[in-house]
């Protein structure tokens, strides 16, 4: 059963339609997610401007590695209000809206080879609450619909039954397909989500007992519970009509 309300989905999409990609990029070095990748020499040297590189491994910014990082940054912003560090992105692309990146083909980004499972794991999906996971799945659904990868999206859901049970059931571009049930899409506080990620990285990189004790103490504290923040789209402090009108939907 779909637990996403039509009004909250439209408000989320309207916000992303009016938010430039630049807002989803962190200019703080050190926030990029780590992932193991196999770098092809051809991918680097076949780029028109191989000296214009991005990320930490020297791959040209048009390469698949950077596309994955960019999509992860967008989804991180959508679920937590804070993106990752993605340098050397062209100004034109930075000014495109987040919704354009997720739904349109004229951005110059080839998102056809996105690995949903890898992105979800790198964003610590296991520590997201229900509403955060739904926001992530909304982004996946938009990308799958744009790229014609709905079969891959459905396969990912079938391999993750807990996500399939909460996956928003809608057709991008057609709000009539959304069931009108109550859901505020509220999310866990940004500091709490970030603390989850940083603590898990500490545990993974340095298996010290003190880290584990700190993690358990924090996990069992009230900080892990859902808390309000400025990114809750239902109660934006500067909320006005521009966040509830969605063009073309």
Curated annotation (Swiss-Prot):
It comes from the Viruses. Keywords: Capsid protein, Virion. GO terms for cellular component: viral capsid. It is found in: Virion. It holds the Pfam family Seadorna_Vp10. InterPro entries: Seadorna_Vp10 (IPR009930). Forms the virion spike 'foot' and helps anchor the VP9 spike 'head' protein in the virion. This is Structural protein VP10. The gene is Segment-10.
């Amino acid at each position: 059963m779909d637990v996403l309300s039509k009004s909250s989905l439209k408000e989320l999409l309207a916000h992303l339609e009016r938010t430039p990609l630049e807002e989803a990029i962190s200019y703080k070095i050190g926030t990029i997610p780590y992932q193991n990748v196999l770098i092809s020499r051809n991918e680097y040297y076949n780029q028109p401007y191989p000296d214009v590189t991005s990320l930490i491994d020297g791959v040209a910014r048009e390469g698949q590695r950077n596309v994955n990082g960019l999509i992860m940054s967008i989804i991180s912003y959508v679920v937590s209000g804070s993106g990752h560090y993605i340098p050397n992105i062209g100004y034109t692309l930075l000014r495109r809206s987040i919704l354009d990146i997720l739904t349109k083909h004229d951005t110059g980004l080839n998102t056809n080879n996105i690995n949903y499972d890898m992105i979800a794991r790198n964003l610590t999906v296991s520590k997201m609450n229900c509403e955060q996971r739904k926001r992530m799945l909304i982004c996946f659904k938009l990308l799958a619909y744009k790229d014609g990868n709905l079969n891959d999206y459905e396969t990912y859901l079938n391999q993750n039954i807990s996500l399939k049970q909460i996956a928003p059931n809608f057709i991008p571009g057609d709000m009539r397909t959304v069931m009108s049930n109550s859901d505020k899409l509220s999310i866990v506080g940004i500091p709490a989500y970030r603390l989850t990620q940083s603590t898990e990285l500490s545990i993974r990189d340095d298996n010290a007992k003190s880290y584990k004790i700190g993690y358990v103490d924090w996990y069992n504290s009230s900080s892990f519970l859902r808390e309000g923040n400025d990114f809750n789209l239902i109660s934006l402090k500067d909320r006005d009509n521009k966040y509830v009108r969605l063009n073309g939907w």
